[in-house]
Amino acid sequence: MIKNLWNLGLKTADLDADLDFLQKVGATIVLRDTLPVEDDRLDYAIVRLGGVRLLLFPNVIFEDQVPGGVAPGLTHAVFEVDDLDAEYARIKDLGGQVLIEPRFVQAGFGSRRIAFFRSPGGMVFEVMQILESKVD
């Protein structure tokens, strides 16, 4: 079952400019790193603002799964789960369209297993099982 909202994902056209802006607004940078993804690396940052984690990327991991690409702005919600395999099967059985099948990711935030879905109405969300956390 879904435990909680872990973060909101946002695509930005200019990561440095948005980080500067968000710090001025009151955000704290928790982590700035790169995420190895297949044959590429994605720059990202995690900030905390108003008690919420925001994960900022110039490109989102599911970009190639969305016709026409993904516009800058809010892209998806990330929900923490205890058992990714069980939750993946449950959401798929309920009609969630799989965008990214379960996979292992590791970077400055720690290690996780993740999967991405699109709801019947088009909402994109991620389910994530934290294996090791290096950020609060």
Short names for language-model regions:
Residues 50-54, 61-62, 84-85:
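Short, charged/polar surface micro-motifs in flexible loops or helix N-caps
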Residues 38-39, 57, 63, 107-108:
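Short secondary-structure capping/turn micro-motifs that flank functional sites
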Residues 1, 4-14, 35, 43-48, 66-136, ...:
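Vicinal oxygen chelate
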Residues 55-56, 126:
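Conserved beta-strand in the GNAT
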Residues 59-62, 130-132:
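Acetyl-CoA-dependent GNAT
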Residues 2, 9-53:
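Core segments of cupin and vicinal oxygen chelate
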